[in-house]
Amino acid sequence: ILNSRFSKEYDAIKDYFDSLDVSTIDAINTHYLEDFFFTITGKTKHEKPNDFETMKTWFCSHAGISLGEIEKVDQLYCICFQGKQGTGKTSLFRYLTPNVLKDYTKENLTDYENKDTKISLGENFLILLDELGESSKHDLIKLKSLITQKAVKERRPHAKRDTVLMRRAGFVGTFDKEQVFDDSAGNRRFIVIEIQKVEWSKLKEIPIDEIWKEAKFFYMNGAYNKSIDGMNTENNSKYEKTNPALEAIDNLYFTLDKNGNEFYTATEIQSHIEKEMRIRLNTKSIGEAMNKMGFEKVSKAIDGISLKRYKITAKVTKSEIAESKK
């Protein structure tokens, strides 16, 4: 009977969001999302405008997904609660789930590529990604791919053929480390909210239904920021792991100067850093670091040989760099 034509489709997630009455809400009197933000961060939306806007975007986007309108949602994100152990990050995940949807959550997700994980995208309201700080770089790459999926095609248990499942789940991550991400380029999918100390007595006074009702209202009226990649990249920079190439270039050797009059290839820079710092770096990491720091790369002929070179002002002389290549 499970897969017969007599089985009636029941969508608990959509039914819940359809039942949220937003007819009495107006933009002036909304405050539940702001109250939630203040209760978990200790800051107002005016004190941390970027953090509030990115958090609001996650709630509104997930309201759209829950209404079955994922194709209208431009970008998909994972909201992450960052804070010391014991601040209640995992409990916040459970708070975000309305009582009628308690059976539609998944915790302890570890394998980002197996069949059950992909099916869970179409069957759950929220998925917890606990302790992201312990994830490897390879795992985070797989996770970013999972976060961006809008639909999956898999064969459910007892089914005879594959089924296309539209994404329903939202991702909630937690971590306590301050260095989690390997690079800024792929971090825009993560919305990090720093948790100081959750005031649970006050949070209990904020009905989760009212928060999701506001999120639905803002989503339906397009009253949220749909382009937060830049804000995410800026916000998440402090959670990036130490980059040896960035440190060597930024702190020890070269300063950004738009009027720089010296030109060096990534290989020349590599040779000098390795000699002076006694660390081995590849030209790819050096190139990425130079580009991230804004150094201009131009075609420049030296001694009759035209190569792509970085325009810089060096804190060491040309002869010192030339000597390091010997």
Tell me what each language-model feature is.
Residues 226-326:
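DNA transaction DNA-binding modules
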Residues 125-148, 181-186:
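Conserved AAA+/SF3 P-loop NTPase catalytic/coupling segment centered on the Walker-B
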Residues 123-125, 167-170, 185-191:
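Short glycine-/polar-rich loops that comprise or flank the Walker A/P-loop
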Residues 117-122, 156-174:
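AAA+/SF3 P-loop NTPase mechanochemical coupling elements
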Residues 140-163:
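Conserved catalytic/switch belt of AAA+ P-loop NTPases
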Residues 5-122, 267:
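P-loop NTPase catalytic core of nucleic-acid-dependent motor ATPases
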Residues 181-200:
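A short helix-turn-beta junction within AAA+ P-loop NTPase domains corresponding to the substrate/partner-engaging
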Residues 204-237:
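Long, low-complexity, charged/polar intrinsically disordered regions in eukaryotic proteins
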